[in-house]
Amino acid sequence: FLKVNLNGKRFCNESGPYEFMLHSMEMQPYHTYCDIFDANNKQYAEQFDEVGCCRLFPFPNGAASNMGYDYVWSKNEELIEAGYLQKANTLEELAEKLNIPVDNFVATVNRYNELCAAGVDEDYGKERHRLTPVDTAPFYGIRTGAWHLTTLNGCRINTDMQVLDTNGEPIEGLYATGDCTGGMFATTYPNLFTGLACGRTM
């Protein structure tokens, strides 16, 4: 969904790899952004064709999703009641609830909706099937930021999963697998193959 910074402006391709978007977020005011979506979010989420932990709907082959949409939305209702997720009947009202500049935000949404209608993201290059307008009330928004996920440090291992010492020699009786090992996510987070972290240890 659309993401805007605390100045009410879009700042990234929301469909890019986690780390690309989060590095962009890190450069924004207070390292914070707002996720924005509208009443059609269920329809849009289904057409996003997500994989892994983002998947909210069963796969075409019948495989279950990680968490179903209805379950996730029930949590959103709790967040609305708690005041974290904002719900509004107009874009102006949503901007005020998120405490971001109204004029900037409305202009950003209008520009984004134009790109969605054209089917081409001239600003950031998001794919056509993930260009979904924000034009149907009620509108929703939530402030959020980054988190640590699969950090780059860990135990260095050999092909037998033995942990190595500082000289590159195996430490007797010590083994490590999966995300506990170093270098697994040295360059990117491979969300296209959600079994990769565990599969490499089999």
For each predicted feature, which ranges?
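An anion/pyrophosphate-binding glycine-rich loop and adjacent beta-alpha core
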Residues: F1-K97
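Short, glycine- and charge-enriched coil/turn segments that flank and shape catalytic ligand pockets
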Residues: E96-N99, A118
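Internal hydrophobic alpha-helix adjacent to the cofactor/substrate pocket in enzyme cavities
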Residues: P101, V106-V109, C198-M202
